[in-house]
Amino acid sequence: MAVDVAEYHLSVIKSPPGWEVGVYAAGALALLGIAAVSLWKLWTSGSFPSPSPFPNYDYRYLQQKYGESCAEAREKRVPAWNAQRASTRGPPSRKGSLSIEDTFESISELGPLELMGRELDLAPYGTLRKSQSADSLNSISSVSNTFGQDFTLGQVEVSMEYDTASHTLNVAVMQGKDLLEREEASFESCFMRVSLLPDEQIVGISRIQRNAYSIFFDEKFSIPLDPTALEEKSLRFSVFGIDEDERNVSTGVVELKLSVLDLPLQPFSGWLYLQDQNKAADAVGEILLSLSYLPTAERLTVVVVKAKNLIWTNDKTTADPFVKVYLLQDGRKMSKKKTAVKRDDPNPVFNEAMIFSVPAIVLQDLSLRVTVAESSSDGRGDNVGHVIIGPSASGMGTTHWNQMLATLRRPVSMWHAVRRN
């Protein structure tokens, strides 16, 4: 009997039934299919950056909205970064900037200060330093939810692209929203004027639009411009309303520095927030700030790079400036950091990084208030002016915030006008 059982087992092994062979084959094919799908997902996931926690600012969303030109600009930019990294392996202070393909582990090894120094190329200004923290957050404006947020006079959507072959800046004014919502006047039509600063050269005037609350300009202008002029020139977009007496009345203006857009490498497209032209005269200097957000670490980094042309309070001829950065949530101060004091310098170079822990879920409820102040003997400091940056700000404050969200993990630097308190 034992021999018969052994022979039966041996026969099953040598010549298994047909249905068992089918089961084994189906299982093997299923495993191969699962492995193939997994490998395909891993391969395709390397084609784009990690998904953003904010879908509206995901890279694929921008490519879909603005076309393949964004993808082409990105492909041009990556070899340029790689070339910079390869050509700067000498002194540590001249390390190349990280590309978007660098892993999070390599970023963590660098540390936030070295990473920001690489991206901004701040070697001429010295080593990037960490800011000081301030404990006191008590002030009258701590409970204000509208501090420094200027009333906007509508928005305009523009795009710009620089043709390096013909040295031409192509500007498109696409559409506008809420352009003539003003209580003190009534306008039935409007038009837009584009000027090149600082020469006040008019480069284009749009056709008159009758429906000024939601309109499509669809205007294109070409401006001959040398590459070196991109570092010095600005564009001013001015909207004029036409009243009952057919007079042209300025209803809003916005200025955009070409140096902050990196136009030779990539086009720019976005919404600009118009402001009252009279408020533009309240500027008491300019400040260069860099923002970046790392979603994996939930870390917002603000770099106070430098300021220029500061105007002191009370007609003083000299002062010792420093900068305070407040993190606001719904207008309330959540955190405060400040830079070191620079002695008697209207054009101070700070080059200090400030790191805030910010969960992604509350990022859209936050804003930054950057205050330039004068150091005093009693330690309080007199405020010179401020800048508001965030989703509820206006002008360049909103543009800078949106650009940061559109390029997560990479620093975005812009100049801001410091407005009088």
From Swiss-Prot:
Organism encoding this protein: Homo sapiens (Human)
Cytoplasmic face of the membrane: 40-421
Pfam families according to UniProt: C2
Primary location recorded for the protein, binned into one broad class: membrane
PANTHER family to which the protein is assigned, alphabetical: SYNAPTOTAGMIN (PTHR10024), SYNAPTOTAGMIN-12 (PTHR10024:SF252)
Gene from which this protein is expressed: SYT12
Protein name: Synaptotagmin-12
Annotated family: Belongs to the synaptotagmin family.
Location within or outside the cell: Cytoplasmic vesicle, Secretory vesicle, Synaptic vesicle membrane
A GO cellular-component term linked to this record: exocytic vesicle
Transmembrane segments: 19-39
Record's subunit section: Homodimer. Can also form heterodimers. Interacts with SYT1.
Membrane topology of the entry: Single-pass membrane protein
